[in-house]
């Protein structure tokens, strides 16, 4: 199925498809590359089988992501496609990739995706292209073409790129470069454009969203940005990647005072124990974890809390892990993502002693999941019998409507599965907000019946 064309130039011969691996920041890069190629006259197709060129936008955050990226690269080169590798693996292994997989036609770094059309032009002329800047410095603004799928009602809005922190386990600063924020005016302009396209929810993303603006305004400016975005006619605005140090009184007040900023706090805390956090090069966090969580719950009783955790970090002892379990039991997060430590070459954690065995790390991960499932189920049960506002997004194979309430972020949290009594076409609900009565809950999802379209 062909994507909607933005094209203003003469069509070119190549038909290009994209294969995406990794996070939503990578997805935004993909959408910009799609828009740029379409503008330059290339036919951008969502069906890889019909394309002769495939751009694989890769992830290199952890080993499993690299393995998936390599599988896709080899799959398409084996099919005889001309493959261009973009994203974090291109940035990470710009010399090794073409040497190890000579079938690759081009590389595009994380700070070079704006050059994708020129790269493809050169590839079509038979050149092997390595377009990877040593230090990524580019960030797209609202003027850069971007493909936004009209069949989706959620869009990610990048407010900054890169990171100035140096967490011991994280390779991202080396792959994405230093922090560079967009101006408030640029972000608001893009939000207004997305609203005109029918987007019902925008999700603000960067490596550290609460550190937004530090580089261009001299201080973190998320609160000011939220106050301006609250004036845009987008029903839901969600923030991902908020760090405790940046959740100031002003930021929390912006959440409270804005009707369309949903009270959903995504806090990648990684751990609870001071010793582990110190080893992670996050010593500032231990004293803040407890107080900031208590403050959020006190100021915004309806707040939904999500966190991500790492188990099996070098030096994590049994008592450290028990501290983490007690932390989870005490604060009862709505959603938790848990990952086993992945040693990444180029990070300080790669060389740390006292490795935790994979067997122990996997057992700890399973333990966290088990504890959190019980907490999540209890949390979800509290919604049974209540009425909730739901964004309906799709129809399931079982002919049920699938949507989300504000307490579920797309892709990473649960969904709300809805039945309909009215004998009308289910497609009429897609992309709309409805009021629903919640009738059942499990540890992941809610179930309910639609009352009316809002």
UniProtKB/Swiss-Prot annotation:
Its EC number is 2.8.4.4. It comes from Prochlorococcus marinus (strain AS9601). It holds the Pfam family UPF0004. This is Ribosomal protein uS12 methylthiotransferase RimO. It is an enzyme of class 2 (transferase). SUPFAM superfamilies: Radical SAM enzymes. InterPro entries: Elp3/MiaA/NifB-like_rSAM (IPR006638), Methylthiotransferase (IPR005839), Methylthiotransferase_CS (IPR020612), Methylthiotransferase_N (IPR013848), Methylthiotransferase_N_sf (IPR038135), NA-bd_OB-fold (IPR012340), Ribosomal_uS12_MeSTrfase_RimO (IPR005840), rSAM (IPR007197). Its cofactor is [4Fe-4S] cluster. It catalyses: L-aspartate(89)-[ribosomal protein uS12]-hydrogen + (sulfur carrier)-SH + AH2 + 2 S-adenosyl-L-methionine = 3-methylsulfanyl-L-aspartate(89)-[ribosomal protein uS12]-hydrogen + (sulfur carrier)-H + 5'-deoxyadenosine + L-methionine + A + S-adenosyl-L-homocysteine + 2 H(+). It is found in: Cytoplasm. Keywords: 4Fe-4S, Cytoplasm, Iron, Iron-sulfur, Metal-binding, S-adenosyl-L-methionine, Transferase. SMART domains: Elp3. One of its GO terms (biological process) is tRNA modification. GO terms for cellular component: cytosol. The gene is rimO.
